[in-house]
Amino acid sequence: MAMPRKLKNLNLFNDGNSYLGLVKSLTLPALGRKMEAYRGGGMNGPVKADLGFSDDGIQFEWMTGGLDLISLRQFGAVSANSVALRFSGPYQQDDTNEVSNVEVVVRGRHENIEMGDAQPGEDTEHSMTTTCSYYKLTVDGEEIIEIDLLNFVEKVNGVDMLEKHRTAMGI
């Protein structure tokens, strides 16, 4: 029997700026597929056809303590990949003491910034939702998943899932 790898700490970088001590929490992006049921003649039931990435897109939610001027200055960025965020965290397996370095890199722009409640003498925090056009998950230096929505790239476990599609489209 083995113990699971658990996140022991984390850091976030915003365009190369370390948020060590500033980042309070984050929600790593959910990855989803757009699937549509199909049932044709001779089929005893529906099978879902994969129609690409989910219409929900890639969302990165995160929270900082205090006033975050870097993010506020990035709000309204024109380019769909204006903001670069990098999560880095050690996941430790307590029975073996092994530590895995997990890194998630995203590029996008802030869809929402909530400045939270403001009360004298009380903690303040900002909550950000960054909608992403790029996502890459790396574990111990190995690229597990890379998704580049703007450049039609989707790699999973080293396999370029869209290579044949790009070739067929002449790109």
Predicted segments with their positions:
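A contiguous binding-surface segment within folded domains or other stable secondary-structure elements
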Residues: Q59-E111
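Mixed-charge, glycine-accented linear interaction segment located at domain edges/termini
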Residues: R109-I171
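A mid-sequence interfacial segment
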Residues: E36-N44, Q93-C132
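A short, compositionally biased
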Residues: M3-K8, S82-R86, T131-S133
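Short amphipathic beta-strand/extended segments with alternating polar/hydrophobic composition
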Residues: Y19-S25, E98-G108, E146-L149
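A generic structural micro-feature
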Residues: G52-S54, A77-N81, S100, P120-T124
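Solvent-exposed edge beta-strands and adjacent loop segments
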Residues: M1-L69, R109-A118, V159-A168
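A structural detector for beta-sheet-dominated domains
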Residues: F13-D15, P29, M63-G65, S88-P90, ...
